[in-house]
Amino acid sequence: MEVFEEVRDVVVEQLSVAPDAVKIDSKIIEDLGADSLDVVELVMALEEKFGIEIPDSEAEKLISIKDVVTYIENLNKNK
């Protein structure tokens, strides 16, 4: 499964949005309707799913789904 698909599954579960609503260029807050608490919970769910740690300073930069996918792919490359 691609990283995007795994991220999409987590986003769908955490934000209760339809899978079709989650596109690579979707903005987490603007397009998917997340609030700040949703974002914190989403980051925690992503950390658990991928076995990673996302520092707050990095989490603030994750605006779109593409940002999340790129961040996770880069972490996986550096393992």
UniProtKB/Swiss-Prot annotation:
Keywords recorded for this protein, A-Z: Cytoplasm, Fatty acid biosynthesis, Fatty acid metabolism, Lipid biosynthesis, Lipid metabolism, Phosphopantetheine, Phosphoprotein
GO molecular function annotation: acyl binding; acyl carrier activity; phosphopantetheine binding
SUPFAM superfamilies: ACP-like (SSF47336)
Pathways involved: Lipid metabolism; fatty acid biosynthesis
Post-translational modification: 4'-phosphopantetheine is transferred from CoA to a specific serine of apo-ACP by AcpS. This modification is essential for activity because fatty acids are bound in thioester linkage to the sulfhydryl of the prosthetic group.
Origin superkingdom: Bacteria
Domain Carrier: residue ranges: 1-76
Cellular compartments annotated: Cytoplasm
Main localization, broad class: cytoplasm
Keyword Lipid metabolism among UniProt keywords: yes
A Pfam family matched in the record: PP-binding
O-(pantetheine 4'-phosphoryl)serine: residues bearing it: S36
GO biological process: lipid A biosynthetic process
A single cellular component GO annotation: cytosol
Physiological role: Carrier of the growing fatty acid chain in fatty acid biosynthesis.
HAMAP family in the record: Acyl_carrier
Stated family: Belongs to the acyl carrier protein (ACP) family.
Name of this chain's protein: Acyl carrier protein
Species annotation: Campylobacter hominis (strain ATCC BAA-381 / DSM 21671 / CCUG 45161 / LMG 19568 / NCTC 13146 / CH001A)
